[in-house]
């Protein structure tokens, strides 16, 4: 039996560790990052700009980068198409520290050794982009989808962690939409479990604006509003974790916070909508919305309750007085 290697909490808390480095502050760190987006949405343009920004040490979407060598495996493109994109994006001399390949080995076969070999010849390499993930993997028909996805990424993660690399995997999205954008990534949740960060690009057809959703183990959750023009992505607006949460709260809930009288209120969902003069919310979803966002209501001084009587289903909304509004005078 191999003995379990452990560390005490006391030792762990007293041991200095190098912080995980971020190649692009707030976006790309060491390890595995998955970026997914619809076909023909501009993902490859974005990845090329990311490579150029890192190679030149320039900001990417207004985020600071650390200058380093970059390797872009454009496995669904050819050199002619890459050259056309470079002509559009490069104003001066093209950086020698950005390298391309349009062919690569398969994961679990030659790819890992190819990356190790390239790193040995280019010690300053820190960014590897693989476009796309599907081009380097061979699904195992005898393994379930979760196990296959997890094993696939674990192999790359071990490589990234061991060599201090940021490996970005370009992936596709499902056609079916979801409230959680990260659930739209093609494949099982094994991809989410094994990755360090996930980025989803949502862009409607024939629109030049898009939303970039970002989440990760060492990253603050963010949402970026972007614009795509002439092959270039630019930042329009940025939302942090708290602002994202605020945006996810329906207007109806914000209206409830403003409306509830000091003495509180009780009645049916129909009566609530009538008294608030709300016409765009179905009575059938009122209790669901109130219950789903009861924590937000409580943070804003309103306690939501629900009870059934013989004749009706009643909603109670009680406004909690703050310390300044206390009715007790001593």
What does each model-identified segment do?
Residues 2-4, 10, 18-19, 23-24, ...:
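Conserved inter-motif catalytic segment of the P-loop NTP-binding fold
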Residues 222-330:
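DNA transaction DNA-binding modules
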Residues 53-67, 298:
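Post-Walker A helix-loop "phosphate-sensing" segment adjacent to the P-loop in P-loop NTPases
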Residues 19, 34-36, 40, 44-45, ...:
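Phosphate-binding/switch region of NTP-binding enzymes
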Residues 29-33, 68:
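Pre-Walker A (Motif I) flank of P-loop NTPase domains
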Residues 28, 51, 72, 131, ...:
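Conserved RecA-like P-loop NTPase ATPase core
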Residues 88-97, 188-192, 296-297:
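Short, conserved catalytic or adaptor-binding loops enriched in Gly and charged residues
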Residues 46, 50:
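Hydrophobic positions on the alpha1 helix immediately C-terminal to the Walker A/P-loop
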């Amino acid at each position: 039996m191999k003995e379990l290697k452990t560390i005490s909490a006391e030792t762990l808390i007293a041991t200095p560790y190098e912080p995980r480095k971020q190649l692009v502050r707030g976006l790309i760190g060491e390890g595995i990052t998955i970026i997914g987006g619809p076909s023909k949405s501009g993902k490859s343009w974005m990845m090329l700009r990311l490579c150029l920004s890192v190679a030149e040490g320039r900001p990417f979407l207004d985020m600071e980068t650390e200058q380093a060598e970059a390797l872009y495996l454009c496995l669904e493109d050819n050199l002619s198409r890459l050259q056309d994109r470079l002509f559009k994006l490069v104003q001066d001399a093209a950086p020698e520290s950005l390298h391309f390949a349009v062919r690569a080995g398969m994961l679990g076969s030659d790819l890992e050794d190819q990356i190790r070999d390239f790193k040995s010849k280019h010690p300053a390499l820190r960014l590897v982009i693989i476009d796309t993930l599907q081009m380097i993997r061979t699904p195992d028909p005898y393994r379930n989808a979760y196990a296959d996805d997890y094993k696939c990424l674990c192999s790359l993660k071990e490589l990234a962690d061991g060599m201090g690399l940021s490996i970005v995997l370009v992936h596709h999205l499902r056609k079916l939409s979801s409230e959680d954008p990260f659930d739209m990534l093609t494949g099982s949740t094994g991809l989410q479990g094994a990755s360090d960060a996930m980025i989803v690009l949502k862009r409607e057809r024939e629109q030049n604006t898009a939303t970039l959703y970002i989440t990760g183990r060492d990253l603050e959750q963010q949402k970026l509003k972007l614009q795509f023009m002439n092959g270039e992505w630019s930042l329009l607006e940025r939302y942090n974790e708290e602002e994202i949460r605020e945006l996810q709260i329906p207007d109806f809930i914000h209206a409830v916070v403003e409306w509830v009288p000091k003495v509180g209120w009780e009645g049916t969902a129909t009566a609530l909508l009538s008294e608030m003069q709300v016409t765009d919310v179905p009575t059938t979803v009122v209790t669901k919305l109130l219950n789903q966002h009861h924590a937000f209501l409580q943070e804003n001084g309103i306690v939501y309750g629900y009870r059934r009587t013989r004749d009706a289903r009643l909603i109670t909304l009680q406004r909690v007085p703050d310390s300044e509004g206390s009715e007790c005078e001593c």
